Amino acid sequence: MQMISPRMASGMQEKQYTPSLLSFFIYNPTFGPREGEEEKKILFYHPSDVEKNEKIRNVGLCEAIVQFTRTFCPTKPAKSLHTQKNRQFFFEPENNFWIVMVVRNPMIEKPNKDGKSQTIEYQEEEILDTVYGAVVRQCYSMYKLFNGTFARAMETGGVELLMQKLEKFFYKYLQTLHLQSSDLLDVFGGISFFPLDKMTYLKIQSFVNRVEESLSLVKYTAFLYNDQLIWSGLEQDDMRILYKYLTTSLFPRHTEPELAGRDSPLRPELAGNLLHYGRFLTGPLNLNDPEAKFRFPKIFVSAEDGYEELHLIVYKAMSAAACFMISASVELTRDFCEQLDKLVGPQLTLLASDICEQFTINRRISGPEKEPQFKFIYFNHMNLAEKSTIHMRKTASVCLTSVHPDLMKILGDINCDFARVDEDEEIIVKAMTDYWVVGKKSDQRELYVILNQKNANLIEVNEEVKKLCATQFNNIFFLD
């Protein structure tokens, strides 16, 4: 991606280029061990139009790097390779299956004084291994969510089936990667939870129990409001990647106007005396259509004996969404979908209304929101809870931030420091732009704060962070 910054006079401009994907490939070194069979190792290669010998050469180089680094650390070979122009990331998700992502470093194109030639400056220090390493792991997790493991495809249909699945999935998925907006949130891969009072939470729990009792086919349920999680019956790691898919891919494709409450229905349908405007986000677009297809995406989640395959039904009313997961061995029919629609639609509409009203009341009590002097990111490693006032909104795969990239880089650097040690610690940085950046790590929790107080000193900054902890995290203990 290119950004132009007009820093030079007389029509001469600097061009800034953000990080971009150069190549992405998956190989298994055991598939073509003999000379002349090297191409058999390559299971997927993007871009596909690269000449065959170049693919073989690039994969061979990666094999050599992995083997070389294995001599120093047999259990943890290469993770990344830094060069002036690009950075390579290595990940072995399953035995002998390697994923490699090559990212072009950000660069600045500067015109020379003669106006003809140009000087290129590569900014290799701007790329963080932790961030882009996390992006590679996300790619595999997303593939596994919809296809199961590489080994499963091999058992079912051999190398040919695996290559077909990789091509089908990654051809589309890699187009949604926006590497220029990857940051600390990719490292955490957390879940944003919706704050609720006990009474409303109990209503939701009761709703989930009623649905699972009435529709015995439903094995797991997840409940979200406004793209934030309220309830989940899945394991944490499964919910983490499903949440990523829902909030960055599925929901943005089905946006609808926000509703103020139950008095302003979008397209009300009466079901008895209850408003009903629930709809399927996966599966049939319109239940009244005689040609409607009752096919749902299948997902793979962890189970006691490895994994289980499930139908994913996502059903939405207003800003509330319920995900129902049903064993893939069951065939879902029109009758079942109509039964679900009739049962869930009115109840979900009412619940969405109640949550909206409760949220509005709470906001009124807390008073008008003033532009705070600080922005923060919070993450809890134990329950994957994540909260950010730095990220304004998510669109399909893009997270828009409200602070300068230089400050996001500092947050990433602090996170790298935290990852190196097990002890709790605090780091305070004064940025070149006069912002203060504070990182606190305490008892499996991390808090990052950006303060816009250029005249403050260390003591004042420390006091501000204490105030923030007292107001935003009053029930969470942070060590001083």
UniProtKB/Swiss-Prot annotation:
Matches recorded under InterPro entries: Ccz1, CCZ1/INTU/HSP4_longin_1, CCZ1/INTU/HSP4_longin_3, CCZ1/INTU_longin_2
UniProt keyword list: Lysosome, Membrane
Q: Where in the cell is it found?
A: Lysosome membrane
Determine if Nuclease is one of this entry's keywords: no
Q: Which GO terms describe its cellular component?
A: lysosomal membrane; Mon1-Ccz1 complex
Tell whether Membrane is among the UniProt keywords.
yes
Q: Which GO biological process categories is it annotated with? A: vesicle-mediated transport
Pfam families in the record: Intu_longin_1, Intu_longin_2, Intu_longin_3
Principal localisation: membrane
Protein family (similarity comment): Belongs to the CCZ1 family.
Entry protein name? Vacuolar fusion protein CCZ1 homolog
